[in-house]
Every structure is written in structure tokens, then in C-alpha cells.
Amino acid sequence: SGFIGSNLVRELLARGHRVKVLSRPGSPEGPLAGLELERVTGDISDRKLLQREMAGCDWCFHAAASYYLWLRDYTPMYAANVEGTRNVIEAAGLAGCQRIVYTSTVGCIGLTQLVQGNAVPADESEAVPETQLTNHYKRSKWHAEEVAVKLAQKGLPIIIVNPSAPIGPYDVKPTPTGQIVLDFLNHKMPAYVDTGLNWVHVRDVAIGHILAAEKGRIGERYILGHAEGNWTLRETLAVLAEIAGLPAPKIRIPYWSALVMAYVSEGIAVATGITPRVPLAGARMARDKMWYNPGKAIRELGLPQTPPRQAFADAVEWFRANRYVKR
């Protein structure tokens, strides 16, 4: 029922597939409300339940993840992202699933490199060393991807997809990337940092999962991004300004200043328990441009390339329609 998962369910249903969804006890229907699907209540720590409920399923999509840039205790995040991944994949293998698509992140792929002063986006051939990972979310996903790779080497039919920065509708939580859009719409972004992301429509990411199940090579990983989606944050905010009819921030904050604000913000969070306005993990991520080359997924899978501008327009429309934006 998360951002990518709920969009994936919609795309599967639109193609005539029968869908079974695992939801935690007490989890609201949220973006899946009203959809014709089979809902199973349980937890990814319950291996017997996973194997039983996946029996008879042709495909398994493991898109669930704990995605936070700040927590008092990161132990549950590692349990969900690493051991949860192992449980789901092994259960899917025992249940006889023909294809297992694991949702990783571009955070497990190398960073943009400067070659003779030009930025060269990273691709699937590059792997970031664990020592260079800037936060616990990335570390947990890095270890989870290692689990998926090792299980694929043992013969399980696993395809790994690495979404970049998805944007679009049904971002209920919202995700940290969706929060950028929401902060802009709610006038909470007076300045920006010099960073960059690869933006992609969440619908294309969802379709990319299905294409991976249909066409992906077992043991391979595919960046689900947009070939023309490598934008600086300044460019991103300029596009948002045009779409939303709001002024874009003009003040650029140097990296060191963002880092200081993050340390102060986290200090307050530790004392109060309130999520920091500027997480240290987010500030550290802003140090590098996170640009990627999705050419492999475009060539091998036929990954759709909806213009990123449309992704932002759809996100703005959804946030406004669902009352996330203060009047």
C-alpha cells in the first residue's frame, strides 16, 4: 500500500492480473481502497504465512520497505528491509513463483562522476561501497540487495529494479521526494541546496516492475528512471513554480550551512522526539548529485519515459485534490 506498491497494484489490475496484497495488521486501506484485490493481513516476518499465501502466484513483487531518513532506533528498519527481504524472497522461491521482482534503490548504485568537468550519470555496472553510504536507509537497502543477489546466485528467479526519484499520485505518506513537492506547495521552502536527482513518473516505475517480470534477465538489476530526468534542485523548483503558479526560491544555501542546520535540527529531535525538519541524512545526501542512466531498462525492458514535468503536474494535482496543500 506504499507509494510504488499502490501504483503497481493499479497497473497490474489494469492489465487484467489478479492481485493479492499483504498488509500489516491495522493498516488502513489508503490508496488501495475500492480496488478489486485480495488482501492478506500479516507481516513479512511470518515466513509460513508468506509461503502459504504465495502458493499459486506466478509473480512476486517485493516493494515493501521502511523508508525514513531519521529514527530514534534504526533496528526495526534493518529488520524490515534486510531480514524482511530474505523472508519474502525465500518464501516466494519455496512457493514456486516464476519471477521475483525485488525493489531496491539507486542508492545502491554508484554516484555521478565528474569526467573532465562534465557530470556522468551512474549506471548498473557501478556499485557503491558500503563505506560511502550516507544514511541508515541506504545501508539497509544495500544489505537487502546483497541478500537478493546471493539468492539469485543460488538459482532463485530474481530480478532487481532500482527506482530513482519517483514522483506522481498516491504518495499518501508522503515519501521524502514527495515531501519536496509538498513543502514547495505549502511555502515551506524559502531556499534550496545545490543538489540533483533523477526524476521519474511513479507510473513508469510501476510499469517497469511489470516489464521486469515479463522481460528482465534473472540476476540483473535495472535502473527505473528517466533519460532526461537528471535535474538540479534549482531546475526542479523552477518547473514546480510554473506548474503551481508560485514563486521559486532564489536563495541557494551552501552545503556546510545545510549541514549545520541538520545537526541543530537533529539535536532538537533527540530531545523532543519530534522528527527533524532537516534530517542529517537528507543534508548529507544533498552533497552529491544523484544522477543516473536508465538506458539498460529502456533498451531491454521498454521502460516508458513519461516527461518528468508531467510527473510533477500529476503530483501537484493529487496533493491539491487530497487536501495536502494548505489554502
Stretches with model-predicted labels:
Residues 154-160, 164-198:
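NAD(P)-dependent short-chain dehydrogenase/reductase
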Residues 1-17:
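N-terminal Rossmann NAD(P)H-binding glycine-rich loop of SDR-like oxidoreductase domains
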Residues 80-137:
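Conserved Rossmann-fold NAD(P)-dependent oxidoreductase catalytic core, especially the SDR/UDP-sugar
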Residues 87, 143, 176, 193-214, ...:
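Substrate-positioning beta->alpha
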Residues 78-82, 123-126, 133-145, 175-178, ...:
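Short-chain dehydrogenase/reductase
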Residues 27-33, 37-83, 91:
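NAD(P)H-binding glycine-rich loop region in Rossmannoid oxidoreductase-like domains
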Residues 115-161, 165, 189-190:
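Catalytic helix-loop patch of NAD(P)-dependent Rossmann-fold dehydrogenases
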